[in-house]
């Protein structure tokens, strides 16, 4: 940027993902005066046409994103509307000394089976749940009698309810697990006992500023 003959360096922000739902974050960053850089493995993502720069890098490949961030000397990294990319954003920020939630905490929150185990071990009220690798399907079938149906079958590392199914008997497990695997990068699934909601559900989004 040139102002009165003086070159002012714009700070660079790396945004993970360029889907339609992520365009508002790119536009907002540009309005705030940042040089916007988007990475996404999908070649037809619309965000690349909004950002100042685009690189074809998977947002879930944390080492590749870190290498890109270092090469471009970014000043910040943002993960917006993408749960799978959240661990990458935390990892890169941690490695580069940016303010961030701890990578270990974000990674734990992004894996349903590990998070359920954490909650249970810390005395939170949670439904009966257990995770298995896809190749452990036979072992799961030997243990499924300990669950009360109906149950939920989910990929451990997906979001937006993708690959999630409610089933009423063990005969439906194979199809449900196969459907979950289509949305799991690590090829793991979790089974949880179904909990019926009573009354109203209150939900919202939170954010922190300066650690508060």
Predicted regions and their residues:
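Short acidic-glycine loop/turn motifs at beta-strand connectors
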Residues: 208-212
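CheY-like receiver
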Residues: 68, 143, 176-179
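ATP-binding N-terminal substructure of ATP-dependent carboxylate-amine bond-forming enzymes
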Residues: 5-105
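A conserved helix-loop-beta module that forms one wall/lid of the active-site cleft
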Residues: 94-163, 170
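Conserved ATP-binding module of the ATP-grasp superfamily
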Residues: 125-127, 150-153, 165-198
């Amino acid at each position: 940027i040139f102002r009165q003959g003086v070159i002012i360096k714009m700070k660079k922000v790396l945004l993970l993902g360029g889907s339609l739902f992520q365009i508002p974050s790119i536009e907002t960053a540009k309005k705030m005066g940042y040089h916007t850089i988007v990475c996404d493995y999908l070649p037809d993502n619309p965000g690349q046409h909004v950002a100042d720069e685009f690189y074809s890098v998977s947002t879930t490949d944390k080492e590749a994103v870190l290498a890109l961030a270092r090469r471009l000397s970014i000043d910040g990294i943002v993960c917006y509307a993408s749960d799978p990319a959240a661990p990458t954003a935390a990892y890169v920020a941690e490695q580069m000394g940016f303010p961030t939630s701890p990578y270990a905490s974000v990674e734990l929150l992004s894996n349903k089976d590990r998070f359920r185990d954490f909650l249970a071990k810390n005395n939170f009220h949670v439904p009966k749940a257990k995770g298995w690798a896809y190749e452990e399907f036979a072992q799961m079938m030997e243990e499924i009698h300990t669950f009360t149906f109906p149950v939920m079958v989910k990929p451990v590392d997906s979001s937006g309810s993708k690959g999630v199914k409610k089933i009423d008997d063990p005969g439906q497990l194979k199809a449900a697990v196969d459907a979950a695997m289509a949305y799991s990068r690590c090829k793991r699934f979790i089974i949880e006992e179904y909990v019926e909601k009573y009354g109203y559900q209150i939900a919202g989004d939170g954010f922190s500023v300066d650690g508060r």
